[in-house]
Amino acid sequence: MTKKVDFYFDFASPNAYLSHKVMQSIKERTGAEINYIPVLLGGIFKLTNNKPPMEQFFGVKNKNEYQNIEMQRFIQRHGLDKFQMNPHFPVISLQIIRGAVAADMDGYLEEYLSLIHISEPTRPLYI
C-alpha cells in the first residue's frame, strides 16, 4: 500500500520551501505519494489566533537566532546550499497561491510548483 503524505504549504514560508526541496528524496526513499495542498499561512495564523514566528518571538531572547541556526543545519544536512532568503521577506503570496489552486484544479500543480519559487535564487520573484 502506497503511503500518502499531505504537504500543506505557502510559497511565502521559507520552511515550506526547504521542506519542498527534500520531498522528492522522501518520495524516492519511501515510495510515498506527496499531495501538495496550497494554503495561506497568514489566514491560518489569523484563524488560530497565532502570529508569524517573526512577530510571535520578537523580543524573546535568542529565539530567532536559534531558529536561524536550525535552518542552517537543515540546509547543510540536505545540501541546499543555494538557498537564499528572499530579500523582500515577508512576502504576500495570495496571487501565486491562487495560481497554485487553479493549477491544481487543472491537473498541473507539479509543473506550476517547479516554476514558482519565491526563495529560488535563480528565479527571483518580487511581490
PLM region descriptions:
Residues 21-116:
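Structural alpha/beta surface segment adjacent to cysteine/selenocysteine redox centers
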Residues 11, 90-94, 123:
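Aromatic- and histidine-enriched alpha-helix N-cap/loop-to-helix transition segments
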Residues 2-19:
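Local sequence-structure signature of Cys/Sec-based thiol-disulfide redox active-site neighborhoods
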Residues 17, 46, 127:
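Short glycine-/acidic-enriched loop or helix-start segments at secondary-structure transitions
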Residues 14-15, 23, 80, 123:
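A generic structural signal for solvent-exposed, polar alpha-helical segments
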Residues 117-127:
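Single conserved hydrophobic/aromatic residue that forms the stacking wall/gate
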